[in-house]
């Protein structure tokens, strides 16, 4: 009979330890969702709050329920109406129906504009400084197709599909026509708490953290989720698939994908992206991040509050770059919002700079220069149609590919020119100042210029003017 040697015994012990570690790792990323211990929101004098109670059908086609908004009129003027945006109706008319509106417990008239069904108006007097309790019933038939709002046979992505208040700017409600290049997350920061009832076979992930779950004993379960500082409501659903979770520097990361392997891959890449951003001294703004596998018809993917959606088919390096940019857009574009029709470069361009700086830190100067001059700087030397510039409104761009090339690549090349002139520390200091001074609000070119001047001691307004116009 063959006897184990000491060497074989040690190898066997090492194998058993590795197996136990692998099992523990698998259990740590099991399908049972990790709950964050967060208390219910307290009233906030600076932010409105929304409570949502929804039910989803097993085929992901229909979502319905009640939405309740507690909002204060901080504009200084009196209103005769409250305007909501329901962008799913711009994608597929009739997708969203609102009914049974009440303001402070009294019934109110509600209806959609005849020429733009994504614009809904609740008629009610709303005086300056007054806080109103507004509620309505909502029924959403999720449009079929790819995009930030859409569904397939096995999944649904809802970034800004549910109605939220329109922006009030310059004495009027913003009711710009839907633009697929703009996205659907333009709104005041608010605190959202949602309960979602789904069939047991349906996986759900919210742009925010799960704080509770209940088995209803009837083949459904009710999930409770919340997020402070959301610009819209973002949600991803799957009838088949896998969910994996981990924690990175206190941020709960959730990946929802078509299978366990893809979910684990997205989770690892998102964790690397958050670590890279943190090592640059920039803080991810939310306690949670959801990464959803989805085809969004966008080069990088789609962004909602604390949720990103990305196609997982790319190679690892390319996917890491995309996810890093999308995570950085949680800072530039959600935490600091900007006018997505007329100043989209304030989100995509600085996010691209963050990704390039992370790439240089990770791969080294030689690899960075090869990529920068081979892929990024070349965008500044390409001929484009008249008016298609970094500073142009979205109506100038012919499609997502053109907009990506101009905003992400040519724009990043321009800003990285400033970084080369002042050094990484000063440039990152400017980005940090810009975020700190505008967090929860809205960024502008003037605010960006001011942050650059404060951090570098130089006036870059002329440089930026030339960059935006060229």
Language-model-derived ranges and their functions:
Residues 90-155, 219:
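A surface-exposed beta-strand-loop module
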């Amino acid at each position: 009979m063959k006897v184990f040697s000491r060497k074989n015994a040690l190898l066997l012990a090492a194998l058993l330890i590795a197996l136990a570690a692998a099992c523990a790792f698998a259990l740590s990323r099991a399908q049972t969702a990790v709950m964050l211990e967060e208390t219910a929101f307290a009233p906030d004098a600076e932010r409105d709050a929304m409570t949502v109670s929804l039910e989803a059908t097993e085929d992901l086609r229909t979502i319905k329920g009640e939405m309740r908004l507690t909002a204060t009129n901080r504009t200084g003027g009196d209103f005769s109406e409250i305007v909501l945006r329901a962008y799913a109706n711009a994608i597929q008319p009739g997708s969203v129906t609102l009914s049974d509106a009440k303001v402070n417990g009294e019934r109110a008239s509600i209806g959609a504009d005849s020429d733009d069904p994504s614009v809904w108006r609740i008629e009610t007097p709303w005086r300056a400084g007054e806080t109103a309790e507004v509620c309505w019933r909502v029924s959403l038939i999720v449009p079929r197709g790819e995009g930030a709002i859409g569904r397939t046979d096995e999944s649904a992505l809802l970034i800004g599909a549910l109605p939220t208040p329109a922006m009030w700017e310059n004495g009027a409600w913003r009711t710009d026509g839907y633009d697929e290049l703009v996205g659907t997350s333009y709104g005041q920061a608010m605190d959202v708490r949602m309960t979602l009832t789904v069939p047991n076979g349906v996986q759900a992930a919210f742009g925010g953290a799960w704080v509770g779950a209940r088995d209803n004993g009837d083949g459904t379960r009710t999930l409770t989720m919340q997020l402070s500082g959301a610009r819209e409501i973002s949600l991803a659903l799957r009838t088949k698939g896998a969910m994996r979770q981990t924690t990175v520097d206190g941020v709960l990361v959730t990946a929802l994908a078509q299978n366990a392997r893809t979910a684990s891959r997205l989770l690892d890449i998102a964790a690397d992206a958050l670590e890279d951003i943190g090592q640059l001294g920039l803080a991810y703004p939310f306690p949670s991040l959801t990464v959803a596998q989805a085809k969004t018809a966008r080069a990088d993917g789609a962004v909602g509050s604390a949720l990103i959606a990305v196609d997982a088919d790319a190679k690892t390096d390319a996917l890491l770059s995309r996810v890093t940019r999308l995570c950085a857009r949680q800072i530039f574009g959600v935490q600091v919002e900007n006018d997505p029709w007329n100043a989209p470069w304030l989100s995509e361009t600085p996010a691209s700079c963050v990704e390039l700086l992370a790439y240089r830190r990770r791969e080294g100067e030689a690899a960075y220069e090869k990529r920068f001059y081979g892929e990024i700087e070349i965008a500044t030397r390409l001929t484009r149609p008249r008016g298609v510039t970094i500073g142009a409104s979205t109506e100038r761009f012919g499609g997502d590919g053109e907009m990506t090339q101009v905003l992400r690549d040519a724009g990043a090349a321009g800003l990285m020119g400033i970084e080369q002139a002042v050094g990484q520390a000063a440039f990152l200091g400017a980005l940090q100042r810009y975020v700190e001074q505008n967090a929860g609000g809205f960024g502008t070119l003037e605010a960006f210029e001011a942050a650059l001047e404060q951090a570098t001691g130089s006036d870059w307004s002329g440089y930026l003017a030339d960059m935006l116009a060229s």
